[in-house]
Amino acid sequence: MRKQAGGPCEKLNFPLVELEPYARVNRETTKLNKAHVRRDYSGRSICQPDTNNPTRWKYERPLETIRAWQDVAEGKVPASNEKAARVSNLKTVPSLKRENKEVNANSKPPVKQQEVIESTVISKSQSPSVKQLKLTESTLLAPSSSLKPSVSLKKDISSNLLCAAASNGYFRRPAAMRAQTLVPITQPDSKKNELKQKFKHLVHHVLT
């Protein structure tokens, strides 16, 4: 017998394979979005380390940063001139002025100082009196113009200076804040606020 059109069997006549919907239906664009490549002032791409990976952030720092930290340990300081700092931020090699000229990696005390130290050292065979010991101590500790220490007393390196060294004179906010701007360290907050106020007044004056 021939089935009538529109019967109950016709409703169960589903397709066996359902085609995948088009990309345009599934997502907004057919094109894949490329990650924006960061480029420097001359157009070369800047390789940024993976900030989400804590081990890379801890152990794999860029060479420039490592060198800058070494410079700070040696006693070099980033240029205090704001314009010079900006310019050095663009260059590959940071322009740093040496604060501590006497500091060297393999520096030995001068010959005169060594001689004085050797002459003041007392052997065990001699049993000096308290007065003699005091005299020797005073000669050792007395500051003399002829004896200059090879390494002058190191100052405590401030966190600001380390930040400056790590980013060539600029303090970079942490990556978690998603702040791409570089804030110069030298400018205090009060000065910034004054500048903001001046700018507001200027804008208000122009608009009115």
From Swiss-Prot:
Keywords: Meiosis. The keyword Magnesium does not apply. Pfam families: DUF2406. Residues 77-114 are annotated as: Disordered. Disulfide bonds: none annotated. It comes from the Eukaryota. One of its GO terms (biological process) is regulation of cell wall (1->3)-beta-D-glucan biosynthetic process. Signal peptide: none annotated. The keyword Protease does not apply. PANTHER family: MEIOTICALLY UP-REGULATED GENE 9 PROTEIN (PTHR28186:SF1). Has a role in meiosis. This is Meiotically up-regulated gene 9 protein.
